[in-house]
UniProtKB/Swiss-Prot annotation:
This is Protein-L-isoaspartate O-methyltransferase. Belongs to the methyltransferase superfamily. L-isoaspartyl/D-aspartyl protein methyltransferase family. It holds the Pfam family PCMT. It comes from Thermococcus onnurineus (strain NA1). Gene3D superfamilies: Vaccinia Virus protein VP39.
Length: 220
């Protein structure tokens, strides 16, 4: 597939998400156009990168459907200069989109070595390797060296909200995380940390993510 064809197909996907009200803000629309999904999929799946469905990536994992990533980014309300932590790097696409929105460094944690390598290659290709820092480790523990965070985005389903992630949020910060069953059914939680350290949870409907594995998540 020619790059021009991939760009046209991707443009139509982004415009469809806008028409459907999934992409609501111009800044998320522009980020999607600047960071196309086809740069983050396996070569054999590039021709399907514009389709609004998850696709397989190494390590038995998936790259999320475009509509799901858009929903999470709109909920996150990312602003320039925010300190963002991304859990479950996967392909690196979510972290690159976040970096494009905040215009500064983003930290992302991945437990599968094969995916760390895959994400780093994709980020290099897309031009975000200097701003997106991929750390290998247990994402359920967050990444304390760069805490506290304005936003934490989690691209895997947890049995409950991991306490270390809440602890690493700034007062007024937000955690976007799927919570629920191991077997691909969760609710999307928007967890807001209040100034007194307590949290308020808003639920945003059913989603389907791979499980969040780790000390404060599911066990392997």
């Amino acid at each position: 597939m020619l790059m021009e064809d991939a760009d046209v197909l991707w443009y139509h996907t982004v415009e469809k998400l806008k028409r459907e009200g999934i992409i609501r803000s111009e800044k998320v629309r522009q980020a999607f156009l600047k960071v196309p999904r086809y740069l983050f999929v396996l070569p054999e799946h590039k021709k399907w990168a514009h389709v609004d469905e998850p696709l397989p990536i190494p390590g038995g994992q998936t790259i999320s459907a475009p509509h799901m990533v858009a929903i999470m980014l709109e909920l996150a309300e990312l602003e320039e200069g925010m300190n963002v932590l991304d859990i479950g790097t996967g392909s690196g696409w979510n972290a690159a989109l976040a970096a494009e929105l905040v215009k500064t460094d983003v930290y992302t944690v991945e437990r599968i070595p094969e995916l760390v390598e895959f994400a780093r290659k994709n980020l290099e290709k897309a031009g975000y390797a200097d701003r997106v820092h991929v750390i290998i480790g247990d994402g359920t523990k967050g990444f304390p060296p760069k805490a506290p965070y304005d936003r934490i985005l989690v691209a895997a389903g947890a049995p409950n909200v991991p306490e270390p992630l809440v602890e690493q949020l700034k007062p007024g910060g937000k955690l976007i995380i799927p919570v629920g069953s191991y077997h691909l059914w969760q609710e999307l939680y928007e967890v807001i940390k209040l100034k007194d350290g307590s949290v308020k949870v808003k639920r945003h409907g059913g989603v389907a993510f791979v499980p969040l594995i780790g000390e404060h998540g599911w066990k392997e």
